[in-house]
Amino acid sequence: MTSQSSRFFVPFKGKHYETGINGKKVLVVGASFYCDKYDCPCFSDCTSRDKKDSSPYNSTCPEYAKHGAELRNEPTYAIEENYPAYQRFSQMICDVVEERANNIWDFVAFTNYVQFFVPTKNTYKDYLSDRDFEAFIETLIELKPDVVISWGMVTIDDVRTNNKYVIDKEKLPDSEWYICHLKVPGIDHSITLFCCFHPSSKDWYEDFDKCAEYLRQVIDYEK
């Protein structure tokens, strides 16, 4: 972790992020990264839900070190691996902006909300901390996105419901609770916050068409 930073994970930034999607800079925020190396001697400490700090193992994790990799760069590694959830999200973008579908990650930035490796596939409320929200705001100030797409319901209280920077919660029903806006100190423009189900959930498919419709509005794209 860098000095005076709440953030552990370094966001992935696509090479055309500044160009964006239809001229809008888009930051995608997932829930958490998990570790399944249960036999690793570092596992219990690295994924401790009490400590919530994987940084001591950033460059010494046995699994990552043998590949010359660092834990903090997991957002980039996850994009390179193109896990099923990421493929499903790309499918959504395909439905919205067809010409960008094959290389959508080149045009967006990505990170996860929780700032340590969790010990389970699912993200639970007790994994979250104030540090994660501080890291989220830190990332917004750094990347200055026009749009934030937040995956999942576990983080929604932090990202939206209890977020003091949301300026128009009263208008959420107008978009069936998909769209609101943030005004963060240090950023001149307001940020559109788009909250949807996590691509790994069954609700993702059940809500797919409606989600695509509102996402199309957010990026001002017309088929």
Language model feature labels by segment:
Residues 1-81, 132-135, 139, 178-186, ...:
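Active-site and ligand/interface coordination hotspots across diverse enzymes
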Residues 27-28, 110, 147-150, 195:
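Structural recognition of the beta-strand scaffold that forms the well-ordered cores
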Residues 65-84, 113-129, 198:
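Surface-exposed cleft-lining segments at the edges of enzyme active sites
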Residues 31-36, 114-118, 153-157, 198-202:
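Short, solvent-exposed loop/turn segments at secondary-structure junctions
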Residues 21-26, 97, 101-107, 181-194:
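Beta-strand-turn-beta hairpins that frame and shape the catalytic cleft
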Residues 123-137, 156-223:
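C-terminal capping/extension of enzyme domains
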Residues 76-99:
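Signature of the catalytic double-stranded beta-helix
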Residues 136-153:
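Proline-aspartate-enriched helix->loop->beta-strand connector
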